[in-house]
């Protein structure tokens, strides 16, 4: 049985920007403190929600370093270092390890998507270049590449490929993956709304967008789900479902950044090609947020 990096809810943290679109490190520190004091179980930096795709190489490394330093060992820090260029992913992963990241999040190759054989070779090359645990990330709606249960089985043989962030919405495939891999591959939900269903199949939590705005509540939902407290987990899922879905009425992380701004944080805008929400969308988001949160 492999060691689990975290159990519960890890926040897929946004990257705040200044008006000139540079990284707002002062606000990033505030977000980190908000997460830790609210009970988040881990912090994922430079993932999809962190707009890693539009960070420069220098920014990417600096955000990882800043996050590790400010967290200061209070919760695990997982750095997004995946790429469709395996050599670059190796380089970035080694830098993240040297900076003190506790684990890596590795998205599947995208655009130049590969075969299952190539996927295993790529992930094994990256994992073999570091000693810290790696979480692979399956999000075919973005990458055009889906990890099959049989491929997961091959990946689970690699010692430091310890988990997957699963966002393919295929419960049947997940059941097969759990059957094949057992405790050699931890499963985390990659969708807030799927936390309870995936936990019922042995999942250990969620890497969450929703945690950006309600970390305490997402921690409680994930913890109840993993513990098998069905009554509590169901009640919390039902309670927050509409707000979770509202955070995806536009391309992630556009709505969640807007939500944080409405809460009084200063996260700024997303970098292009991600454009601001429409006034109509913002109005709908406010309605859902007002049911649970105090708006600025």
Give a label for each model feature.
Residues 2-11, 15-144:
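Active-site beta->alpha loop and helix N-cap motifs at the rims of alpha/beta catalytic domains
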Residues 5-16, 38-40, 200-203, 207-296:
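C-terminal alpha-helical cap/extension of soluble enzyme domains
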Residues 19, 25, 57, 149, ...:
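Alpha-helix N-capping/helix-start residues
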Residues 28, 60, 64, 89, ...:
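A general structural signal for well-ordered alpha-helical segments in protein cores
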Residues 128, 142-248:
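Catalytic alpha/beta core domains of metabolic enzymes, predominantly
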Residues 138, 160-161, 271-272:
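Glycine-rich phosphate-binding "P-loop"
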């Amino acid at each position: 049985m492999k060691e689990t990096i975290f159990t519960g809810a890890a926040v897929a943290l946004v990257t705040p920007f200044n008006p000139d679109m540079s990284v707002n490190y002062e606000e990033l520190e505030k977000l980190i403190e908000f997460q830790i004091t609210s009970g988040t179980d881990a912090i994922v930096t430079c993932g999809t929600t962190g707009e890693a795709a539009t960070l420069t190489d220098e920014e990417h490394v600096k955000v990882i370093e800043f996050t590790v330093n400010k967290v200061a060992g209070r919760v695990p820090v997982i750095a997004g270092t995946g790429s469709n260029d395996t050599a670059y992913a190796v380089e970035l992963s080694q830098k993240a390890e040297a900076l003190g990241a506790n684990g890596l999040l590795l998205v599947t190759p995208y655009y130049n998507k590969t075969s299952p054989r190539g996927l295993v070779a790529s992930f094994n090359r990256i994992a073999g270049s570091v000693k810290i645990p790696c979480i692979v990330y399956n999000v075919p709606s973005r990458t055009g590449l889906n990890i099959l249960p049989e491929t997961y089985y091959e990946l689970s043989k690699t010692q430091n490929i310890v988990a997957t962030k699963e966002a393919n919405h295929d419960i049947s495939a997940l059941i097969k993956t759990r059957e094949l891999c057992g405790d050699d591959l931890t499963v985390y939900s990659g969708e807030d709304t799927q936390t309870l269903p995936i936990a019922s199949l042995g999942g250990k939590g969620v890497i969450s967008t929703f945690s950006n705005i309600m970390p305490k509540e997402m921690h409680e939902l994930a913890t109840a789900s993993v513990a098998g407290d069905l009554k509590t987990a169901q009640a919390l899922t039902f309670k927050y479902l509409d707000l979770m879905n509202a955070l995806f009425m536009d391309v992630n992380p556009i709505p969640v950044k807007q939500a944080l701004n409405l809460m009084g944080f200063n996260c700024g805008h997303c970098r292009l090609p991600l454009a601001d929400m429409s006034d109509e969308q913002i109005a709908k988001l406010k309605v859902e947020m007002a049911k649970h949160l105090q708006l600025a």
